[in-house]
Amino acid sequence: WRIGGIEREIPIIASAMDGVIDVKMAVQLAKLGAMGVLNLEGLQTRYEDPNPVLDKIASVSKTEFVTLMQDLYAKPIQPELITQRIKEIKSQGGIAAVSVTPAGASRFGDAIAAAGADLVFIQATVVSTAHLSPDSITPLDLAQFCQEMPMPVALGNCVTYDVALSLMKAGAAAVMVGIGPGAACTSRGVLGVGVPQATAVADCAAARDDYAQESGNYIPIVADGGLVTGGDICKCIACGADGVMIGSPFARAAEAPGRGYHWGMATPSPLLPRGTRIDVGTTGTLEQILRGPAQLDDGTHNLLGALRTSMGTLGAKNLHEMQQVDVVIAPSLLTEGKVYQKAQQLGMGK
């Protein structure tokens, strides 16, 4: 599949979260045929050496971590570290995909462009293409930003047909879909905003298809959040996604920077935290999680193998054909005939 002109074997992107992606993970994911996105407003650009900070986050109790993270993330972003991290990824053969908020794009767009990032993700809760920013920052015009940046820009996150279509018309190289479904996200509880992911993906996929018919330009949509197993990924593509972005499955990799923990990037908000830190553990290497061989029976290892096998079972030769398979809403599929798995906490009963 292709995103922003970049061809990848695996339609899986690792989320721009500090417990998931650092330079090493971004490089390794690229070598394995996938992609990781480095958050340019996280620890990697606030600290020359983020490892002691990551150790602190992994060591504190449930009652202490929000206050600690608010303190740690209060350190200013250093523009020179933005340049350094992008160059570190590229010099090691990785794909320099990076993420910023709209406010961050306004502040650091020039530095990102000068450093030569390969792909930029602007991620926020999107309800229109004009974003309000703090008084000290000029509001970001997404269409103008996409036009002026020398590399492709992916925009999100949205959950409706109209907003997805607006983002495509603004010049998005890809549209991110999902508000609140992530394992470490609490936006739905804090803000009351969101749409179930399958519905959001289907609606935004319809916008993509209509825009492609109207303009001749096919803009991939990426389902971001709420996907834990290979089966989740397969179902999301069946609903119309071109690719997926996942966090917690990769946070469980031995190479992940989170030390077995995963947290939402809005967790350190000084005024209104909208994420939490969860203990996901360490279950295998990055290669085992992405390409196998699987050592777990719950669908969280060999995600690529699961997608290929599902496609073969359904007779889909490629992702486009996978998007055309029948989708049925059937909650009983998760429990039907699984009485022993549930009783013994095995497989699908975990």
Identify what each model region corresponds to.
Residues 73-87, 150, 154, 192-223, ...:
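Alpha/beta catalytic cores of nucleotide-metabolism and tRNA/nucleoside-modifying enzymes
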Residues 1-214, 220, 250, 338:
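Active-site entrance/lid segments in N-terminal catalytic domains of soluble metabolic enzymes
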